[in-house]
């Protein structure tokens, strides 16, 4: 496995996403400039300039025409993917931590941190016709994580048919919200640490969560029933499900502030492949000299990308031996 090294960010990567076809990778980092790359050869196509703080999240719509980012400069921005121009900016009360387009692309959601006297809030906005007036438009729906929840949203997904939103929280809980009634449908507390990341399977029936409690867990995306647990010795920052095999890839490592040795050989910063059903680790891939902050599978399942605290995005393309591998 000879990786592609995508070098362009000056600071730690916060999130990476493939578009639906998998020909583009979008990456955000703590350096104010979300970037877009060709996934085939690692060429950087451009940056999206406009944020004034660390960019925490990114998502691209189904047609790869629009991009949404949320940042520490207390704003969420919508971009034209092709030209890099800002379509609209939404001011927030605190840092925007998560942002996602719905499957239809008609709506988008973003959440803000619990900070400066404001509770963590979740917003649903209409993004069919975005222009500069979106900064003053009221959201379609606003959910406040009030006294009963009192924990900030750290990751978020859209549920089936754009009817629900799934949120992962700082206290390890995962909740499903009905967007019609603005009420909580279900919640589980299987994790004991902050939920760093959640990603859906290709068909949307399952989701994998990555937590600081050193485990990743597989849930039914409708009932939130915990199906499988993948155990490691270190915090898991990101996890993704293969679209073609029954495999899960996990990435993490020590927290950035606890890292003392940054040797790639120490084995602390590998991405780890687990069997989806048997919960057993069967491979590790070295490379980063710092924790892995974000992972994403290519939609064709033949490669995956990792973004690390070292500021690099690495694209790992699987060898022939990966496809011939039989789990015993």
Swiss-Prot record:
WD repeats: 8-47, 50-91, 148-187, 190-229, 287-328
Disulfide bridge partners, by residue number: none
GO biological process: formation of cytoplasmic translation initiation complex
Keyword Repeat listed: yes
Primary location class: cytoplasm
Record-linked SMART domains: WD40
Gene3D superfamilies for the chain: YVTN repeat-like/Quinoprotein amine dehydrogenase (2.130.10.10)
GO terms assigned for molecular function: RNA binding; translation initiation factor activity
UniProt keyword Zinc present: no
Pfam families per record: EIF3I
InterPro entries to which the protein is assigned, alphabetical: eIF3i, WD40/YVTN_repeat-like_dom_sf, WD40_repeat_CS, WD40_repeat_dom_sf, WD40_rpt
SUPFAM superfamilies associated with the record: WD40 repeat-like
Localisation: Cytoplasm
Keywords assigned by UniProt, alphabetized: Cytoplasm, Initiation factor, Protein biosynthesis, Repeat, WD repeat
GO cellular component, one term: eukaryotic 48S preinitiation complex
Assembly and binders: Component of the eukaryotic translation initiation factor 3 (eIF-3) complex.
PANTHER family linked to this entry: EUKARYOTIC TRANSLATION INITIATION FACTOR 3 SUBUNIT I (PTHR19877:SF1)
Similarity comment: family membership: Belongs to the eIF-3 subunit I family.
Known role: Component of the eukaryotic translation initiation factor 3 (eIF-3) complex, which is involved in protein synthesis of a specialized repertoire of mRNAs and, together with other initiation factors, stimulates binding of mRNA and methionyl-tRNAi to the 40S ribosome. The eIF-3 complex specifically targets and initiates translation of a subset of mRNAs involved in cell proliferation.
Protein name (database record): Eukaryotic translation initiation factor 3 subunit I
Protein's organism: Culex quinquefasciatus
